[in-house]
């Protein structure tokens, strides 16, 4: 690693059990929207919008492993279905990768957020549209 480069972000929780693994096994209370042998969708305890759902694989895997897995397409379809059911006026499906994206859970997951006008995603940081140079 080059001098001055930030440490790579961890791929798993540094200590203690994985929060989403504990939730997936039912050891923690959860408000389930969908469950089968591979996936679990539940309401997030953190509430920044009226609808905040998490879609997680029951088997522990990192965000990167989840996105390249065969299970991801099934999870994405579920996220879309839940978004359509719970947020008929619009919703966001997103994932955070790493420290700069504020990833705090190192178990792969999708967020389904809506139930309110969400606005410009980075409006708190943007003062003008960024100028992106043309490729080449």
Residue ranges and their predicted role:
Residues 1-136:
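HIT superfamily nucleotide-processing domains
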């Amino acid at each position: 690693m080059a001098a001055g480069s930030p440490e790579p972000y961890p791929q798993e929780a540094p200590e203690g059990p994985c929060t989403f693994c504990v939730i997936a096994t039912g050891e923690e209370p959860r408000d389930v929207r969908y469950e089968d042998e591979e996936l679990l969708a539940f309401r997030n305890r953190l509430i920044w919008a009226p609808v905040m759902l998490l879609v997680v694989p029951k088997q522990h895997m990192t965000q990167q492993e989840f996105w390249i897995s065969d299970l991801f397409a099934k999870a994405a379809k579920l996220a879309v279905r839940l978004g359509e059911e719970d947020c008929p006026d619009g919703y966001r499906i997103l994932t955070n990768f790493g420290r700069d994206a504020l990833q705090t859970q190192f178990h792969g997951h999708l967020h389904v957020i809506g139930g309110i006008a969400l606005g410009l995603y980075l409006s708190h940081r943007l003062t003008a549209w960024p100028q992106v140079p043309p490729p080449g």
